[in-house]
């Protein structure tokens, strides 16, 4: 499996994709998604547009170079450690309580 498209899955609330060999993951427009656990993949793309209910995102050791969570306004916990991120777009996340972005190539937030 190289790609997984879950775009528009209106009822999806929880996703566990740990250790799946994915290159792309499309989670756009999943309005009820609250938790997503993705790890050990070799992602080039992670699309999170249109996920206002996402509270917890763990995308560790995926090889991501960029990540945009600016549209995830309910996010309380984000762990994106162990990637190759040079760009992390967080925007305004008023509920964010925990952020782990260690072991990346970030110059600034």
Question: Where in the sequence are the language-model features?
Answer:
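Concave beta-strand-loop units of leucine-rich repeat
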Residues: 1, 8-23, 27-43, 50-64, ...
């Amino acid at each position: 499996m190289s790609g997984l498209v879950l775009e528009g899955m209106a009822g999806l609330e929880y996703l566990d994709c740990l250790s799946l060999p994915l290159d792309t993951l499309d989670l756009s427009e999943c309005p009820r998604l609250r938790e997503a656990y993705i790890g050990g993949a070799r992602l080039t793309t992670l699309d999170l547009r249109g996920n206002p209910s996402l509270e917890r995102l763990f995308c560790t050791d995926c090889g991501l170079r960029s990540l945009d969570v600016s549209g995830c306004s309910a996010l309380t916990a984000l762990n994106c450690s162990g990637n190759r991120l040079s760009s992390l777009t967080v925007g305004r996340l008023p509920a964010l309580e925990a952020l782990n972005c260690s072991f990346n190539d970030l110059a600034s937030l």
